[in-house]
Regions:
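C-terminal terminal-subdomain/extension
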Residues: 4, 75-134
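Short, basic/aromatic beta-hairpin or loop at an interaction surface
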Residues: 1
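Compact nucleic-acid interaction/catalytic patches
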Residues: 28-35, 40-78
């Protein structure tokens, strides 16, 4: 039985550096299989306006010090000091139907943007994970 993905999702393409929630339901372990925050890696590709390239974010520290797990300068989802990491080895394209803004209240949603320094580090981490950087 396959998992059902909601048929709504975003009605617009998110901008590079925006942080959203992605429902990874239907993936297979060791892939991400639940809702996770993600950062949008780039603006839409031509003829692919229904897809977004994202990098998952996590508050769980990596088991090993690897260059594709990037420690961010702040937690973009809360005001606490809990560290946040970009899991750059798990970058992927997802349907906009999997994405939603972050709910902060009754019918209130936000799309925070990652700062440029953190984003540059995430891009480097993705390059390392995909073998584009030595």
């Amino acid at each position: 039985m396959t998992a059902q993905i909601k048929d709504s999702g975003l009605q617009f393409h998110p901008r590079k550096r925006e942080i959203l929630i992605c429902d990874f339901k239907g993936n297979i372990v060791p892939e991400i299989v639940k809702k996770r925050p993600v950062v949008v890696l780039r603006d839409p590709l031509p003829y692919r306006s229904d897809l977004a390239i994202v990098v998952p974010l996590s508050s769980t520290p990596p088991k090993y010090g690897v260059p594709y797990c990037v420690l961010l300068s702040q937690n973009y989802l809360s005001q606490d000091d809990k560290p946040m990491y970009a899991k750059c080895d798990l970058a992927c394209s997802v349907s906009l139907k999997r994405l939603d803004r972050i709910k902060v209240g009754v019918r209130k949603y936000v799309c925070p943007r990652m700062n440029e320094d953190d984003f540059a580090n995430v891009v480097r981490g993705v390059g390392w994970a995909f073998g584009f950087v030595a």
